Design a protein with these regions (language model features):
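Local cysteine-cluster metal-coordination motifs and their immediate loop/turn environment
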Residues: 112, 190-191, 212-242, 270-276
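Ferredoxin-reductase
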Residues: 1-80
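FNR/FR-type flavoprotein reductase catalytic core
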Residues: 68-216
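A generic structural signal for residues embedded in beta-strands
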Residues: 36, 84-85, 227
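Short, Lys/Arg- and Gly-enriched loop/turn segments at beta-strand edges
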Residues: 42-51, 89-99, 237
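Structural signal for conserved beta-strand scaffold positions within catalytic alpha/beta enzyme cores
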Residues: 6, 51, 154-156, 209, ...
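Short Fe-S-cluster ligation motifs
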Residues: 235-239, 243-280
Length: 280
């Protein structure tokens, strides 16, 4: 029984659920993920762990409502339970020994970036946080980032909050000015991570990307999350989700991400119709 103990809407399309899962909370580390099913007939959704409280036995997940599965998950209320909650899965982000790190997040990917920034801060690492959103209304987790970052920069596409522009602008400025980052860790849309890597590679700044492709079982059996990394096939669920950004084939990953769009659109429409019927 994985009960929802707290629910919070972070913006009009992004929701945080705090779920009682003591065994997962006991072992969870920053960068790992879970697979959740809202109901018995729901699709399996991989979501990176956004936070955990070992004493209370709670695990937080943050998701954007985009398809049928996340719509079903978003329909659950405090006191209700999700059907499945499996994890922690994947490898934790490697942060030991890092002294000066820039964490770059984009959109809902900031939910993944936050626990990594927090873990770095807790071990005494200097953390520069750069996050990007389309506009002011979509900004999430600002207070939480400010609490764990030595320097924090918000970028918005339209300039309605923070600075106007994309995350690569302040990142390149920091590198050119001699920030001397040990590593850049980036999580967000594939196109954003691709351009972060294009920014850091000429300066030879090690860059780790968190890959979150389509996934079914989370154990490497289905092969749905395969990626090409350094010319070899890797599976995000067991080999990742973190990879050397210099070696990831982003173009292939973006192409694979579009393969199921028609099916997702059909499932979303069907779920919308069901929700309308329930309201009526």
């Amino acid at each position: 029984m994985f009960t929802i103990v707290k629910r919070r809407e972070l913006n009009p399309t992004v929701t945080e659920l705090c779920i009682h899962a003591p065994l997962i909370a006991k072992k969870a580390k920053a960068g790992q993920f879970i697979i959740v099913r809202a109901k018995e007939d729901s699709e399996r959704i991989p979501l990176t762990i956004a936070g955990f409280d070992r004493e209370a036995g709670n695990v937080s997940i943050i998701f954007q409502v985009v398809g049928a599965g996340t719509m079903q998950l978003n329909s659950l209320k405090e006191g209700e339970a999700v059907h499945d909650f499996v994890g922690p899965l994947g490898k934790a982000t490697e942060i030991e020994g890092l002294k000066n790190v820039c964490v770059v997040g984009g959109g809902v990917g900031c939910a993944i970036a936050l626990p990594i920034a927090q873990a770095l801060h807790e071990q005494g690492t200097k953390v520069t946080g750069i996050v990007g959103f389309r506009n002011k209304d979509l900004v999430i987790l600002e207070d939480e980032f400010r609490a764990c970052c030595d320097e924090f920069i918000i970028m918005t596409d339209d300039g309605s909050y923070g600075e106007k522009g994309v995350v690569t602008a302040p990142l390149e400025k920091k590198i050119v000015e001699g920030a001397n980052f040990d590593e850049v860790i980036t999580i967000g849309p594939l196109i954003m991570m691709k351009f972060v890597v294009k920014t850091t590679k000429p300066h030879n700044v090690k860059t780790v990307v968190s890959m979150n492709p389509i996934m079914v079982d989370g154990t490497g059996m289905c092969g749905g999350c395969r990626l090409t990394v350094g010319g070899q096939t890797k599976f995000a669920c067991v080999d990742g989700p973190d990879f050397d950004g210099f070696e990831v084939d982003f173009d292939e990953a973006m192409h694979r991400g579009t393969m199921y769009k028609p099916f997702e659109a059909h499932a979303r429409e069907a779920e919308c119709n069901l929700l309308k019927q329930e309201v009526q």
